From Swiss-Prot:
Coiled-coil residue spans: none
Matching PROSITE patterns: AA_TRNA_LIGASE_II_GLYAB (PS50861)
Compartment(s) where it occurs, according to its Swiss-Prot or TrEMBL record: Cytoplasm
This protein's name: Glycine--tRNA ligase beta subunit
Classification via InterPro entries: DALR_anticod-bd, Gly-tRNA-synth_bsu, Gly-tRNA-synth_heterodimer
Major localization listed first in the record, in broad terms: cytoplasm
Reaction(s) this enzyme catalyzes, per UniProt: tRNA(Gly) + glycine + ATP = glycyl-tRNA(Gly) + AMP + diphosphate
Length: 690
C-alpha cells in the first residue's frame, strides 16, 4: 500500500468575504464525497482558505493500483436455452451487453434456481488521472447562487480561477481543472513583485506561504492571530475590544497576510451617538472600535492591513483620512437630523412607498396605529402610549442617518425619541418593533414593543397576502416566514392572550373594506401560520405526532395550543400512558365501524352490567372535576385525571359485550364510548398518538 501527501490549491481572484467560509467548506466536503465514491482511502484532510485561494492537504492518500470486481447475473438457465439447446434471444442480449461469449459465462446455482453469471476484475482508473477530475467536480458542485463566467470556454465559479496546483509529494499531477493546467507554482500575495511561489513538496504547505510572504492560509489560525493582535493593541492603551464575531469573520475573510494597526481620530467625533459611531467604524470601515474600562469609546480604532510592510505609517495616515471623512459625514447627518423633532417627519412618510399596491409608509403607519390600539386591549400596554409609538414607528426611516445607515432603523428612532423627551417605553418600542430579526433572536421586552412588533409584522404579512406575494416552497423574498415565527414567538413567550383568527381578520380589514376574497385570504393566512407553527414546534424539539394531534383540533388560540402541546408531551412521559392511548384507539375503531351516526343521550337505566355503570360514574365524576380545569386550561391536571379511566375501561372491555342483542342497550354502550372519545379529543386528536 503506497501512501503519499496530496496538495491541491485553487488560485482565484478575490472571493466574496461573506461566502469564503461556505465555499471552502463545500469544497472540502465535496472532495471527501468524491474520494469515498472512488474508494480512495486517506488518513485525514485539512482545508485552507484566503481571499485568493482554496486549498486541501490530504495526508496518507492511498495511490495503490486497484481493481474492482464486476458481477453480472443473467437470465435463468431455463430462459437461456430453447428446447433444442440453442441460446435464447434473452441470453444472447445479455452476453452482448457483458461483451463476452457463452464460454466466458459461468453458472450460479442456489436454492432458488440456476442462472448465467459473469464475474471479472477490472482495473480502476489511475488515481493520478482521477484527481484533476475529482477536483473539478468538487468545485463545480459547490452551491453558489451568484457565479461569474470567464474565458472563451465560459467557465463558471464564484470568481475566476487563475491558478491550479496539484502536487503528490514532490510530483506535479498533470491534468486540467477548468482548462487550467496544474503546476507546482502557488499564487503569491497580490502586492508581491513575484506573482508565484514555487513549491517542491506537498508537505511544505502551508508553511512555505508564511515563510515566503507572511501569508496565513489556515483560516482559523489567521482568525486567532487577528483576535490576539487586536486585544494586545487595545491593552497597550488600557482599552478592550468588544466581541463581534461577525466582524472578525468578515475581516479574516478579507485578508491573507494580516497586520493590526492602531489608528486614532479626533475626540470631537465622540459626541456623535455611540450607535452611529460604532456603525461607521465597524460596518463602513471594517475596523475595531476600542472601549475603556467604563465601556465608553476611546478615540482610537484598529485597522487590519492585508500587507506586511515597514511603511505602516502611510497606511495609518491613509486610514485616518478615510475615517475622518466618514465620521464627518456621520456628524453632519446627525446634526442635520436634529434640526427637527422626530414626530415632524410623519407627513414625509407620504412620499415613501411601502410596497407597490400597498400605499405609502404613512398609510402603513396609520394601519399599525389602528392595529396596535386593538392589540393593546389584550396586553398590559397603555393604549395612548401604544398609539404614540405607532405614529413614531417609521419616522426615522426618512432621517439622513438611517438613509446612510439602513441597519440603524429603529435604533436611531429610539435615540431621537429620547432626545425629544418621549416616554422611555415609547422610545424603546421604536427599536423593539424589529425584534426578533432572525431565528433565536431576543424578543421585545416592553409590552408596547411587543404590540408594535406584532402590529408591524402582521400588517406586512396581510399586505403581501393581499397582493399575492405569498411564499412558495423554495422562495420567500419578503421573509414572511420569519415574520410569522416572530409573531408566534412573541405571543407565546410573552403570554399575550391574542386570538390568531381575530388578529388576522382585524389586520385584513384595515386593507380591505369588505371584499369577497376576504375569506379566501383569511384561510390562506391561517394555513400559512399553522404550517409555520408546526415547523417551529418541531425545531423546538416537540414530537411531530404530538404537534399534529393538537393542531388537527383546529384551535386558533396560540396560548391554548401551546399549553396542550406541553400537556400531551407531559402525558406521554407518564407511566402506563400508552395503555390509555391504546384504549382510545380501540374505542375509535369500534365507533368507526358504525355506519350510522351515534346520537342521543346516555340512559343509565339501560345499564345492566356493573362495569358499564362504574365507567359511566367515572365519566360524570370527570366532567364535574374538570369543568373549571378546562376553563383555566390546566391540561396537565386534566390528563392526570384521564389516567383514572385506565382500569374502568379495561374492565368494561373485559366484562361488557358491546354488541348486545337488544339494540337499545347496544346503542347506549356505543354512546358511552362516544362520550369517552369526546373527552379525550377535547384536548387533542389522540389518533395521531397511536
Amino acid at each position: 500500500m503506497t501512501k503519499k501527501i496530496l496538495l491541491i490549491e485553487i488560485g482565484t481572484e478575490e472571493l466574496p468575504a461573506r461566502l469564503l467560509s461556505k465555499i471552502s467548506l463545500y469544497f472540502y466536503k465535496n472532495f471527501i464525497k468524491e474520494l469515498d465514491f472512488h474508494n480512495i482511502s486517506y488518513k485525514n484532510i485539512k482545508y485552507f482558505s484566503t481571499p485568493r485561494r482554496l486549498a486541501l492537504k490530504i495526508k496518507d492518500i492511498d495511490i495503490t493500483e486497484r481493481f474492482v470486481e464486476i458481477k453480472k447475473r443473467g437470465p435463468s438457465i431455463i430462459n437461456s436455452y430453447d428446447k433444442d439447446g440453442f441460446l435464447t434471444e434473452a441470453a444472447t442480449r445479455w452476453l452482448k451487453h457483458c461483451g463476452i461469449n457463452i464460454n466466458q459465462a459461468i453458472r450460479l446455482k442456489n436454492e432458488k434456481g440456476e442462472w448465467l453469471f459473469y464475474k471479472t476484475r477490472k482495473k480502476q482508473e489511475n488515481i493520478e488521472s482521477l484527481i484533476p477530475k475529482i477536483t473539478e467536480s468538487a468545485l463545480k458542485n459547490i452551491s453558489i447562487k451568484k457565479s461569474m463566467r470567464w474565458g472563451q470556454d465560459n467557465q463558471k465559479f464564484s470568481r475566476p480561477i487563475r491558478n491550479i496546483v496539484i502536487l503528490l509529494d514532490k510530483k506535479v499531477i498533470p491534468g486540467d481543472v477548468f482548462n487550467i493546467t496544474s503546476k507546482n507554482l502557488l499564487q503569491n500575495h497580490l502586492s508581491s513583485k513575484d506573482s508565484q511561489i514555487k513549491i517542491k513538496d506537498a508537505k511544505d504547505y502551508p508553511k512555505i506561504l508564511l515563510e515566503k510572504n507572511n501569508i496565513i492560509a489556515d483560516y482559523f489560525i489567521r482568525k486567532e492571530k487577528i483576535i490576539e493582535d487586536i486585544e494586545n493593541i487595545a491593552k497597550k492603551i488600557k482599552g478592550f475590544i468588544k466581541k463581534n464575531n461577525v466582524l472578525i469573520e468578515e475581516v479574516t475573510a478579507l485578508v491573507e497576510s494580516p497586520k493590526a494597526l492602531l489608528v486614532n481620530f479626533q475626540e470631537k467625533f465622540l459626541q456623535i451617538p455611540k450607535k452611529i459611531l460604532i456603525n461607521t467604524i465597524e460596518k463602513k470601515q471594517k475596523c475595531f472600535p476600542i472601549y475603556n474600562s467604563e465601556k465608553k469609546l476611546l478615540p482610537y480604532f484598529i485597522f487590519i492591513s492585508n500587507i506586511q510592510t515597514q511603511e505602516s505609517e502611510k497606511i495609518i495616515i491613509g486610514n485616518q483620512r478615510v475615517m475622518h471623512a466618514r465620521l464627518s459625514d456621520a456628524e453632519f447627518f446627525f446634526k442635520n437630523d436634529r434640526k427637527v423633532k422626530l414626530e415632524s417627519r410623519l407627513l414625509s412618510l407620504k412620499k415613501v412607498l411601502f410596497q407597490n399596491n400597498l400605499g405609502s409608509l404613512y398609510e402603513k403607519t396609520l394601519r399599525i396605529k389602528l392595529l396596535i390600539k386593538w392589540i393593546a386591549k389584550y396586553s398590559s400596554s397603555d393604549v395612548e402610549d401604544s398609539i404614540r409609538a405607532a405614529l413614531l414607528s417609521k419616522c426615522d426611516l426618512v432621517t439622513d442617518v438611517v438613509c446612510e445607515f439602513p441597519e440603524l432603523q429603529g435604533k436611531i428612532g429610539m435615540y431621537y425619541a429620547l432626545e425629544d423627551k418621549e416616554k422611555k417605553d415609547v422610545a424603546t418600542a421604536l427599536e423593539e418593533q424589529y425584534l426578533p430579526r432572525f431565528s433565536g433572536d431576543k424578543l421585545p421586552c416592553t409590552p408596547i414593543g411587543c404590540g408594535l412588533s406584532i402590529a408591524d409584522k402582521m400588517d406586512t404579512l396581510s399586505g403581501m397576502f393581499y397582493i399575492g406575494n405569498i411564499p412558495s416552497s423554495d422562495k420567500d423574498p419578503f421573509a414572511l416566514r420569519r415574520l410569522a415565527i416572530g409573531i408566534i414567538r412573541i405571543i407565546l413567550e410573552k403570554n399575550i392572550p391574542l386570538n390568531l383568527e381575530d388578529l388576522i381578520k382585524k389586520s385584513l380589514s384595515l386593507y380591505n373594506k369588505k371584499n369577497e376574497d376576504d375569506l379566501i385570504l383569511f384561510d390562506k393566512m391561517i394555513k400559512f401560520f399553522m404550517i409555520r407553527l408546526f415547523h417551529w414546534y418541531e425545531e423546538t424539539g416537540y414530537s411531530a405526532k404530538i404537534i399534529k394531534s393538537v393542531l388537527s383540533c383546529k384551535s386558533i388560540e396560540l396560548i391554548d395550543i401551546h399549553k396542550k402541546i406541553q400537556a400531551i408531551s407531559f402525558f406521554k412521559k407518564l407511566k402506563d400512558s400508552q395503555s390509555i392511548i391504546l384504549s382510545i384507539k380501540r374505542i375509535s375503531n369500534i365507533l368507526a365501524k358504525e355506519k350510522e351516526k351515534i346520537n342521543g343521550d346516555i340512559n343509565k337505566k339501560l345499564m345492566i352490567e356493573k362495569e358499564e355503570i362504574i365507567l359511566f360514574n367515572n365519566i360524570e365524576e370527570f366532567d364535574n372535576y374538570t369543568k373549571n380545569l378546562f376553563l383555566e386550561k390546566k391540561y396537565n391536571d386534566i390528563l392526570i385525571k384521564i389516567k383514572s379511566f385506565e382500569n374502568p375501561i379495561y374492565n368494561f372491555f373485559k366484562k361488557v359485550k358491546i354488541y348486545h342483542s337488544d339494540s337499545k342497550i347496544r346503542l347506549n354502550r356505543l354512546l358511552l364510548l362516544s362520550k369517552l372519545k369526546k373527552i379525550f379529543f377535547k384536548i387533542a386528536d389522540f389518533s395521531y398518538l397511536y
